[in-house]
A protein has these predicted regions:
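Short beta-strand elements in bilobed, periplasmic/extracellular small-molecule ligand-binding domains
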Residues: 46-48
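Conserved acid/base catalytic micro-environments in cytosolic active-site loops
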Residues: 1-23, 29-44, 55-70, 74-359
Length: 359
């Protein structure tokens, strides 16, 4: 993973090409059909096969050129977790997205799958009626399949490039006005806290960042990842394993302590305030920002004030521009922002926004 913090960035260009080829795996015939219709509704995606269990999925991957597998967890014959390593071994570069219910068990298995090679997850509605009415689920499914499919092709020599995804194309237009001059990293900057924002592709990126950093004992770490409730609970557990640091969802009113990771809980914005000379965590259900709750911007705005700008921000892979406004407030207050580079980002939206702004 690369972080952009100095020099000149020259955004690349994209070309139209073949649709992302998908295998849908679910033991329910009805759910397979609904997932297939949802994905096939986008011209940039083609469902080339479906399977009712992990063993059948492995057979399909051997027969077909597939970019992305949407993989159910609980199935007869062979479940998703058993099939996962065999699918990855059968076709190097294959992107596997776990389809999980919004339960503690489902979230736990999904995070475990990501730590074992899956690239992402989609929280799956529990009934056909929910899928038919859940526009958010459909958008999430399509965007993740296209993002990961395109990322897999970029990293795989000799394969056809993916048809560009509309949000990504918009970002290209926004950021392709010429070379971008970035700020130099201050040599004597000493932050009092670290803040990380991420979205699509974030869990994988977060695990890598914390594995590389190891224990951070002299400051707190604040993480806002676009993720639903329950999943953020499990994310915190995996960040603790990756970093060797205590990590948990933030609790409203708890004092901030150095050497801990605070994760924004799903459906809550996470902020920090100074009260009685100490820094205190706060959670709120104020309206979503950038269509997200939790959002990165509220966290960064609060940190710019609470820490008088002594904040180091890492903006990791993610769609949209959440965190760009908050990052400007951090920089204006004297803080520093580093962004994941385009080559290693699944979606260069959030890091691209701060990079293009020269932050």
């Amino acid at each position: 993973m690369g972080l952009v913090d100095a020099g000149v960035k020259k955004p690349g260009t994209s070309s139209a090409a073949a649709p992302i080829r998908v295998l849908v795996v679910d033991d329910s015939h009805v759910i397979r059909g609904l997932l297939t219709r949802t994905l096939d509704s986008d011209p940039g995606i083609k469902v080339v096969a479906s399977a009712s269990n992990g063993k059948a999925a492995i057979d399909e991957v051997a027969k077909n050129e597939i970019d992305v597998v949407v993989l159910d967890i609980e199935m007869p014959v062979m479940d998703g977790m058993t099939a996962l390593p065999q699918l990855i071994a059968a076709r190097p570069g294959l992107q596997v997205i776990m389809a999980s219910t919004l339960t503690l068990k489902g979230a736990s298995i999904s995070m475990k799958a990501i730590s074992r090679g899956a690239v992402d997850y989609v929280p799956k509605p529990t009934s056909t009626g929910e899928i038919n009415s859940a526009e958010g689920f459909k958008r999430d499914l399509i965007s993740k399949v296209k993002s990961w499919g395109a990322a897999g092709r970029r990293r795989k020599p000799g394969s056809a490039p993916a048809a560009p995804m509309q949000p990504g194309s918009a970002l290209k237009r926004l950021y392709s006005t010429g070379p971008i001059k970035l700020r130099d990293m201050p040599t004597l900057f000493r932050p009092d806290c670290l803040a990380i924002g991420s979205s699509t592709g974030g869990p994988q990126a977060l695990f890598k960042v914390f594995q590389m950093m190891g224990k951070v004992t002299n400051m707190p770490v604040f993480v806002t990842q676009h993720m639903p409730a329950t999943f953020t609970t499990i994310l915190a557990e995996h960040l603790a394993q990756a970093s060797g640091m205590p990590a948990a969802e933030a609790k409203d009113g708890e004092p901030v302590t150095a050497g801990r990771i605070y994760v924004a809980p799903g459906d809550f914005h996470m902020t920090v305030a100074v009260e009685g000379g100490r820094k205190v965590m706060h959670l709120d259900k104020n309206p979503p920002e950038n269509f997200c709750r939790p959002a990165v911007d509220p966290m960064l705005r609060s940190l710019a004030k609470a820490y008088n700008g002594k904040v180091m921000v890492m903006m990791l892979t993610g769609m949209g521009q959440d965190g760009a406004k908050g990052s400007k407030e951090i920089v204006d207050a004297g803080g520093v922002v580093a962004a994941q580079d385009e080559a290693t980002s699944v979606v260069w939206g959030m890091p691209g926004a701060v990079t293009s702004a020269g932050l």
